Amino acid sequence: MKKFEFKYQFEFFCSPIWIEENVKNPTPRNVEIADLDINPYLKKELEELNHLYQEIFNDNYPPESDFKDAISEYIFVNRVLTSVELLEKEVGEQYTFVFDYPKWRERKEQLSRKLVELYTKP
């Protein structure tokens, strides 16, 4: 039997959780974090990460929605990478877990290099 996909992906104006429904025509449905049957501490972390992400939205010019500095983004990315490992363990038996690990790990490396440059300038 096919497992439905459980996708962890941040987007503006919605939860970062997407779960497929419907056996004949699998369609992703956005699911509120509060509705997940997971560890309460992990649930709280996911809620906080989603809140932090939603805060970066720029109402005046949406294409410029971004973190204000490399440090805040680096901390956010690290927290996302930690939360995704735990979330996959929580739901991985029930669903096919989907997360763009390469993108997030690459972003962490980019930010790490940027921070090294920032702190090693004379």
Q: Predicted segment positions?
A:
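Intrinsic low-complexity, intrinsically disordered or marginally ordered coil/linker segments
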Residues: M1-P122
